């Protein structure tokens, strides 16, 4: 390899890493206490691979769950199985964060869910929302942690 090729390869690596770093968003911890894991992504379970990370909630339900970045509530699921009370937030960069096994939603989200449950005459709902319906700010409390759905103890599935 000649010097020019090495120089160009190094230049592209530096520019590429700069672009990646300037586009990376700083995400907030969803809790007001340090994160401890109770489950890892890809961990082998009895009948599946775990598709998220589980955060301990100090052994209790009812801890405030904050949004990690601004965005909008793009999906809400309520079910006695799976995530139980689940919340999906889509962020400006296109990523979606999932919050599962929630005890209850914030008032504005809970009001919307209740309205839809009555309209559909069903406790179980799987709602897909438009960006203008329920926008959220970074650090906003959107729910309380819980143990709903297919959960073996209080935690936040993220």
Specify the residue positions occupied by each region the protein language model found.
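Histidine-centered catalytic micro-motifs
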Residues: 154-158
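A solvent-exposed, charged loop/short amphipathic helix patch at secondary-structure junctions
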Residues: 113-124
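Surface-exposed, glycine-biased beta-strand/turn segments
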Residues: 22-95, 103-108, 122-125, 132, ...
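A cross-family detector of function-defining hotspots
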Residues: 99
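Bacterial Sec-dependent N-terminal signal peptides
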Residues: 1-26, 30
């Amino acid at each position: 390899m000649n010097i020019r090729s090495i120089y160009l390869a190094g230049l592209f690596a530096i520019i590429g890493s700069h672009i990646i770093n300037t586009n990376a968003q700083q995400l907030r911890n969803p809790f007001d206490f340090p994160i401890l894991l109770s489950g890892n992504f890809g961990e082998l379970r009895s009948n599946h691979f775990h598709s998220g990370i589980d955060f301990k909630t100090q052994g209790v339900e009812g801890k405030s769950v904050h949004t990690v970045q601004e965005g909008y509530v793009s999906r809400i699921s309520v079910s006695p199985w799976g995530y139980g009370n689940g919340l999906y937030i889509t962020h400006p960069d296109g990523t979606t964060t999932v919050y599962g096994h929630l005890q209850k939603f914030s008032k504005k989200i809970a009001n919307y869910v209740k309205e839809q449950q009555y309209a559909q005459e069903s406790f179980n709902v799987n709602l897909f929302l438009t960006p203008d319906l329920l926008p959220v700010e970074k650090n906003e409390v959107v729910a309380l942690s819980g143990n709903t759905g297919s959960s073996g103890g209080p935690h936040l599935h993220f």
